[in-house]
Amino acid sequence: MPMDFQPTSSHSNWVVQKFGGTSVGKFPVQIVDDIVKHYSKPDGPNNNVAVVCSARSSYTKAEGTTSRLLKCCDLASQESEFQDIIEVIRQDHIDNADRFILNPALQAKLVDDTNKELELVKKYLNASKVLGEVSSRTVDLVMSCGEKLSCLFMTALCNDRGCKAKYVDLSHIVPSDFSASALDNSFYTFLVQALKEKLAPFVSAKERIVPVFTGFFGLVPTGLLNGVGRGYTDLCAALIAVAVNADELQVWKEVDGIFTADPRKVPEARLLDSVTPEEASELTYYGSEVIHPFTMEQVIRAKIPIRIKNVQNPLGNGTIIYPDNVAKKGESTPPHPPENLSSSFYEKRKRGATAITTKNDIFVINIHSNKKTLSHGFLAQIFTILDKYKLVVDLISTSEVHVSMALPIPDADSLKSLRQAEEKLRILGSVDITKKLSIVSLVGKHMKQYIGIAGTMFTTLAEEGINIEMISQGANEINISCVINESDSIKALQCIHAKLLSERTNTSNQFEHAIDERLEQLKRLGI
């Protein structure tokens, strides 16, 4: 899936800004006035800004436009009525236009465009209802409406508030006869080139205009939702950043950046100035909503830094995810912002663990072989069954005749799939399942430099009376994970953070590391 983009020799003076659905729903005026206009003004940090928006959500993803559109697809496949949900979406966006767009002409056009897009959705769903089937292509077409409505609104709002902007629809950027069968290198290469063509008029324009791109980027092989998931808007923003050779990709959220732990659960959690791409990927996978891993693959290979920032605190520095090894201009650089070379270098040297996160709704399956198959056949059959029912394994521990696996089961559909898989797994041996568990993951690229971190983590849990159901640690030691009861997850976060990630712990580690370095110097000098 990754592709080898070659870094160019100069910056483009562009920044790509991606805004999530809840940010668009709750803070649209702040986005335009405090962020887009600030970065795009002649004396601003960047002269050129490209905006990418997710589908609008008023409060949560569950109540957002995309979730409602997917619900319509479910109803159409069951030949049920979906008209009421479409009307809720329409009224929500019309009310939004009436509330925020002051110019009558801009408001009227926005309302008209909104109605047209939703009429198209009705046509797609009515056709599917007649056929009794909703294809992945239809799901993509219906789902794209959410990003279109969001970007139409943000374009109108920008123009209404004196920031010239133009709506750019990417839903047909992939031609229907495109031959690629998967989201592979050829697809991403094609898409970046197509995006360059879309961006060309803005790059060459004498007048500064902000392009507002739909986060949905066309009908793709296997379907966008199946192939990428709900993080496709992040990926779209990343590909646009690569296409324009951006100075920076900014992902705007409702938090100040990446913390050492969830500050809602650990009040002492600290904001991190920088993390490595590997750390960000691990934190995302094991529970922290940082950024879609596919997104990082694209921009990091193009040597473009990613900055996580807060729409409610636009002047904050945020957290930067900086490319390893080679900078955009080609020089060697450590994985941190260039403006903080010395301080970040020593911070990286001294810190063992970077952050801790938890992931709830975990089930652990233990399978003991009936010894009717060889060990490699035993494992192969297990994963064949899990793949059939689309079950994902987060952690695994194996021996020749026993396998323990931690699986995320976040909803009723996943639970149904697990029960179906359980029946097949019992053919291979005895099966027992434990539910209401949580994965606790300690993440840090430099943990392997410190002896005893895993021991300290598990000892800390034991001292707090927290039972460990399962342990997993990779050879690269970037992630140490264990499974505990879900009811103990917050206590586990707090006690491990206090032991390994607090300011006091960092100061102590710095002192110990300084002593170790001095002893090593004396040893080399033969003293």
UniProtKB/Swiss-Prot annotation:
Q: What does this protein do?
A: Phosphorylates aspartate, the first step in the biosynthesis of amino acids that derive from aspartate (the aspartate family of amino acids), including methioinine and threonine, the latter of which is a precursor to isoleucine.
**What is the reported phenotype of gene knockout?**
Inviable on medium lacking methionine and threonine. Sensitive to amitrole (a compound that increases flux through the threonine biosynthetic pathway). Decreases survival time in an in vivo model of infection.
Identify the Pfam families for this entry: AA_kinase (PF00696), ACT_9 (PF22468)
Q: How does it assemble?
A: Homohexamer. Interacts with FPR1; the interaction is direct, plays a role in feedback inhibition of aspartokinase by threonine, and inhibited by tacrolimus and sirolimus.
**Reactions catalysed, as given in the entry:** L-aspartate + ATP = 4-phospho-L-aspartate + ADP
Protein name, per record: Aspartokinase
Keywords, A to Z? Amino-acid biosynthesis, ATP-binding, Kinase, Methionine biosynthesis, Nucleotide-binding, Phosphoprotein, Repeat, Threonine biosynthesis, Transferase
Q: What is its EC number?
A: 2.7.2.4
Please tell me whether the keyword Thylakoid is annotated for this protein. no
* UniProt domain ACT: residue ranges: 442-527
NCBIfam families for the chain: asp_kinases
Which InterPro entries does the record associate with it?
Answer: AceGlu_kinase-like_sf, ACT-like_dom_sf, ACT_Aspartokinase, ACT_dom, AK-Hom3, Asp/Glu/Uridylate_kinase, Asp_kinase, Aspartate_kinase_CS
